[in-house]
């Protein structure tokens, strides 16, 4: 299958640069994957499309302020780190720019010297392995010095760090937010529970690989990035109970979808499990775990539009995206939402 089959024209002004004041007031497109029928609504009305006995599966990862701006210890030259993956207590895999300044053995200073980094090695994808030196708790140092690593297509500075977190974010570890969850407020989640819909939490720490473009023209040749997930025994049992009783499993976001499809058996039952997943879902994939998906509007030719095309049908998705552009829906991380059922 060709990457170009997932291309669509997107005017730049439709790329949302900041979140709406009221999370749940974003627009909602409802796509029936069997008929291709489309409805338009507001996210806070999502309860109209849910039924008692359904189960929403949400990703409770928390974004860390993983972007660090510092300077080279000897020359003072500016450097930017983005933390990707913790290897041990003080060692991380990072992205760095400009890369030419980050040679093995070089050291960098952040803040007023509260954090110092030494380059230990390079990685296959052009990143670096670094060791950090600091006093106290690393997370506290990072919270003081780091910035939210918002996606490259967002040019505005984020005024409030909390707006790039879901209201239920709990476990730190992501370099990007699971953005479908940004539309939920505490009040809306409570309303959903009151109507007899379960909310179950799993964890997948989102990596920056989620923004990595597909460079291969034949998409089957694309190498997917790895992300760490945790599905607890309690979460697996709750989801499996819904499956047994005939309710629908609705994944909130592509990250929840990736996780559930990774841990599901052939009958769609979920196993308690943790580990790394590099699952790549594109048209032709047979879904085992989910009956519905809540998701944002994704980049042309991205792995995410390929995943939603696998779930709803490529023709349905490309037509829905064409309508979304015509109706001026807001796209990407801070944009509007789609419910596929």
Swiss-Prot record:
The record's subunit annotation is: Monomer.
In alphabetical order, the GO MF annotations are:
S-adenosylmethionine:tRNA ribosyltransferase-isomerase activity
Q: Which PANTHER family match?
A: S-ADENOSYLMETHIONINE:TRNA RIBOSYLTRANSFERASE-ISOMERASE (PTHR30307:SF0)
Function summary: Transfers and isomerizes the ribose moiety from AdoMet to the 7-aminomethyl group of 7-deazaguanine (preQ1-tRNA) to give epoxyqueuosine (oQ-tRNA).
Gene Ontology biological process: queuosine biosynthetic process; tRNA wobble guanine modification
Q: In terms of domain of life, where is this protein from?
A: Bacteria
The record's principal subcellular location, in a coarse class, is cytoplasm
Q: In which pathway does it act?
A: tRNA modification; tRNA-queuosine biosynthesis
Q: Which GO terms describe its cellular component?
A: cytoplasm
The family assignment reads:
Belongs to the QueA family.
According to UniProt, the name of this protein is: S-adenosylmethionine:tRNA ribosyltransferase-isomerase
Q: Where in the cell does this protein reside? A: Cytoplasm
- Could you tell me the keywords of this UniProt record? Cytoplasm, Queuosine biosynthesis, S-adenosyl-L-methionine, Transferase
EC main group: transferase
State the EC number(s): 2.4.99.17
The catalytic activity, as recorded, is:
7-aminomethyl-7-carbaguanosine(34) in tRNA + S-adenosyl-L-methionine = epoxyqueuosine(34) in tRNA + adenine + L-methionine + 2 H(+)
Please report the organism this UniProt entry assigns to the protein.
Thermoanaerobacter pseudethanolicus (strain ATCC 33223 / 39E)
């Amino acid at each position: 299958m060709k990457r170009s089959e997932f291309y669509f024209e997107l005017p730049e002004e439709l790329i949302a640069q900041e979140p709406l004041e009221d999370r749940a007031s974003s627009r909602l497109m409802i796509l029936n994957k069997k008929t291709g029928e489309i409805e338009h609504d507001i996210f806070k009305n999502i309860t109209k499309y849910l039924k008692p006995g359904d189960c929403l599966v949400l990703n409770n990862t928390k974004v860390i302020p993983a972007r660090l701006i510092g300077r080279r210890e000897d020359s003072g030259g500016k450097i930017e780190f983005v933390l990707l993956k913790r290897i041990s207590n003080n060692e991380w895999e990072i992205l760095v720019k400009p890369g030419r300044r980050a040679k093995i053995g070089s050291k960098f200073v952040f803040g007023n010297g509260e954090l110092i980094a030494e380059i230990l090695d390079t990685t296959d994808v052009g990143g670096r392995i670094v060791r950090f030196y600091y006093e106290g708790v690393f997370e506290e140092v990072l919270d003081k010095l780091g910035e939210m690593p918002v996606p490259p297509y967002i040019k505005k500075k984020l005024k409030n760090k909390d707006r790039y977190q879901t209201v239920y974010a709990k476990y730190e570890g992501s370099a990007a937010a699971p953005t479908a969850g940004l539309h939920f407020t505490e009040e809306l989640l409570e309303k959903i529970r009151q109507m007899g819909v379960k909310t179950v939490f799993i964890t997948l720490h989102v990596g920056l690989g989620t923004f990595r473009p597909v460079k291969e023209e034949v998409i089957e040749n694309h190498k997917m990035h790895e992300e760490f997930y945790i599905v607890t025994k309690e979460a697996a049992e709750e989801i499996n109970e819904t499956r047994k009783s005939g309710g629908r499993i609705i994944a909130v976001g592509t990250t929840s979808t990736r996780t559930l499809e990774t841990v599901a058996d052939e009958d769609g039952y979920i196993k308690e499990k943790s580990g790394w997943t590099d699952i790549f879902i594109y048209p032709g994939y047979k879904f085992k775990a989910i009956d519905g998906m809540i998701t944002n509007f994704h980049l042309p030719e991205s792995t995410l539009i390929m995943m939603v095309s696998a779930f709803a049908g490529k023709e349905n998705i490309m037509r829905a995206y064409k309508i979304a552009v015509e109706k001026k829906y807001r796209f990407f991380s801070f944009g509007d939402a789609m419910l596929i059922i």
